[in-house]
């Protein structure tokens, strides 16, 4: 809880975004007219990747915090992602449009398909709009008009690439940080020289065994700076 205001917390995962959507709120008797809202969207999360949805077999993942949220909130058992890929799902979630209506049915594109293209793909993808229109009505714009301070931390990807126009501030967000954190390549592989206990490691593990996470740090900054006003945070992990 960031402040005395009640906080509504929505949790989802791409590929099965709407599979887990627990809602956590304070006592309804003390619920303000404009509760704080935190929407957490994780990338490439399957419904069996969180322990609280383990039905028949032991889960290989340990997700204690998500499990705790699910016990206090609501779990949806028959809810599905608007699309199995990144940009189409994100656009649909933010705008409320089906990917086909939003002309976002593929991950990359931005132009008409090319016939007889010499690639390894045998299928010609449909035309794909390169970006979500700036004048699109988004969740952030609606909340902004209703007195919310809106913030985004993490992945955006609602256009050809992560940094293409329009950006979050063009779609209704007062504040945005899309820092990934790790910037250098990991050699010889992604498991070496990263988040170690070495003194000079920029991403040294903390006392709980976790590396520094830029998305989380930025999200906490937004929450602390806006704790005394109604806020909406869209927290999308890379």
Regions found by a protein language model. Name each.
Residues 18-27:
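Signal peptide processing junction and immediate N-terminal pro/mature segment
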Residues 27-74:
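Active-site-proximal N-terminal segment of extracellular/periplasmic enzymes that hydrolyze or transfer
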Residues 44, 48, 53, 68-73, ...:
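Structured segments of extracytoplasmic/periplasmic soluble domains
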Residues 58-90, 96-101, 149-151, 174-180:
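Short, structured active-site-proximal loop/turn typified by the sulfatase FGly-forming signature C/S-X-P-X-R
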């Amino acid at each position: 809880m960031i402040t005395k205001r009640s906080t509504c917390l929505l949790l989802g995962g791409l590929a099965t975004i709407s599979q887990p959507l627990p809602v956590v709120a304070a006592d309804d008797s003390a619920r303000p007219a404009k509760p704080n809202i935190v929407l957490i969207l994780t990338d490439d999360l399957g419904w069996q990747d969180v322990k609280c949805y383990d039905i028949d077999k032991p889960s290989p993942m340990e997700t204690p915090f998500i499990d705790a949220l699910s016990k206090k909130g609501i779990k949806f058992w028959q809810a599905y992602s608007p699309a199995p890929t990144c940009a189409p799902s994100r656009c649909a979630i933010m705008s409320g449009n089906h990917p086909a209506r939003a002309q976002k049915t593929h991950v990359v594109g931005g132009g008409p398909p090319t016939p007889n293209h010499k690639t390894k793909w045998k299928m010609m993808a449909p035309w794909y709009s390169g970006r979500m229109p700036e004048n699109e009505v988004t969740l952030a714009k609606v909340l902004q008009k209703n007195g919310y301070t809106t913030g985004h931390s993490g992945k955006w990807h609602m256009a050809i690439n992560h940094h293409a126009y329009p950006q979050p501030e063009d779609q209704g967000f007062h504040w945005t940080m899309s820092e990934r954190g790790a910037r250098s390549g990991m050699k010889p592989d992604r498991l070496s020289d990263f988040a170690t206990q070495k003194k000079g490691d920029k991403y040294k593990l903390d006392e709980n065994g976790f590396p520094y996470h830029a998305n989380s740090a930025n999200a906490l900054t937004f929450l602390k700076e806006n704790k005394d006003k109604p806020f909406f945070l869209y927290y999308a992990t890379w």
